[in-house]
Amino acid sequence: IGRSNVYLFWNIIEPVEGEFDWSQSDIIMGLNEKNDHKVTLYFSIINGETLGPFPNWIGKPTLNGINEDELVNTLDNILSRYNIVDSVIIAGETESQFRYNEQFIPVYQELFSNVYDGIKQKHPDVKFGNSFALHQVLNKNLEDIVNELAIGDFVAFSYAPTDILNEIRKTPEVAIKDLNKIFEI
């Protein structure tokens, strides 16, 4: 079985409250289904340093202003439509959001926990987690943030062999050592 990461954005999938536009996602998900791929859905309310994008009807909420019920409802609609989705990530490059805003970690932990519980009631087999950029975590010593936000069913990592200036200077041997640090974090 193959696997695909699919990025769906709330402002595209539900541009009007309660009205879903499946035109783009049906094509992407249909191709994955046709090729027997399972899907990890990135429905990120956190994208690195930014929140969203959110639909206009939601506006630009702060982290504690995100309506959990609306998020659960939208995710439920997506998961009910696409049974090939077996894992969901609602925060990508999560470490970047909290690098200078650690005081909001408890707010996000509560939001995540409530959304997790709401999704698990209807979709108990779907795995739910957060994603981190390993190279950022290592280059900026953000392991503590990963440890605090290692909640849900899994922790996902992306990786680029870059230094703190975002230049590719790491040898394959150093990159392998970096990747092995996933098991230490």
PLM segments and residue spans:
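Catalytic domains of carbohydrate-active enzymes, especially glycoside hydrolases
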Residues: 1-12, 31, 38-44, 155
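Active-site cleft segment of glycoside hydrolase catalytic domains centered on the general acid/base Glu
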Residues: 22-26, 51-152, 158-181
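Generic detector of contiguous secondary-structure segments
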Residues: 16-30, 185
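Short, intrinsically disordered, charge-balanced linker/junction segments flanking boundaries
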Residues: 1-4, 178-185
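Helix C-cap/helix->beta junction micro-motif
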Residues: 34-39, 122-124
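Short active-site-adjacent helix-start/loop capping segments
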Residues: 12-15, 48-52
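Short glycine-enriched loops at secondary-structure junctions
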Residues: 43-48, 93
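Glycine-rich, proline-tolerant flexible connector loops at the mouths of alpha/beta enzymes
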Residues: 8-20, 165
